[in-house]
């Protein structure tokens, strides 16, 4: 099971046709005027969720999330659980795990599980705030839509560590590749990588560079021009 070279183009096509990714003039929480907008609240149809899960599965089934130097030559995952932080990470972790299972022809992914957290701990039944596989003693990859200020990621790491798990990787759908603020030259993904350490890969399925390079003039010359200008003005130094 290896990454499809076309998964980025395929996903971008779905995101644009379903207006998950749109172009225009948008004011972000940071106050910046962005020429594009990405919202995962629209990831709720079967074709779109499948395209998203397929792209994520392509990344997670490739290095650095798998080990290729195995005795039988079969790539094997470096993690035990895909963790989706509530709420947007929940459909992602389940859909991506399902896609990995569908693709698997070797059994290498048979023991990989999903898990997510409740915002409020359950006081009855099994109790607690974790749904899915127990995290204790397990290696965890966190999957989410984006990293903005890093607050949600830090909370997810805290939950996992409190439950006795170890974060070994992070995958997000989009890296905007822009500086967090005027005092921080790195992007949100870059900051997360710095904070978690070089041994914990933080990767994105798509980036602003992918949008520019793979779509080009298909999004219109003016939109392309504005994207390049935005990157030149706010681009991060990794």
UniProtKB/Swiss-Prot annotation:
Keywords: Glycosyltransferase, Pyrimidine biosynthesis, Transferase. InterPro entries: OPRT, Or_phspho_trans_dom, PRibTrfase_dom, PRTase-like. This is Orotate phosphoribosyltransferase. The keyword Transferase applies. Belongs to the purine/pyrimidine phosphoribosyltransferase family. PyrE subfamily. PANTHER family: OROTATE PHOSPHORIBOSYLTRANSFERASE 1-RELATED. NCBIfam families: pyrE. Pathway: Pyrimidine metabolism; UMP biosynthesis via de novo pathway; UMP from orotate: step 1/2. One of its GO terms (cellular component) is cytoplasm. It catalyses: orotidine 5'-phosphate + diphosphate = orotate + 5-phospho-alpha-D-ribose 1-diphosphate. Orotate binds at residues 37-38, 148, 176. GO terms for molecular function: orotate phosphoribosyltransferase activity. The keyword Phosphoprotein does not apply. Homodimer. Catalyzes the transfer of a ribosyl phosphate group from 5-phosphoribose 1-diphosphate to orotate, leading to the formation of orotidine monophosphate (OMP). It holds the Pfam family Pribosyltran. It is an enzyme of class 2 (transferase).
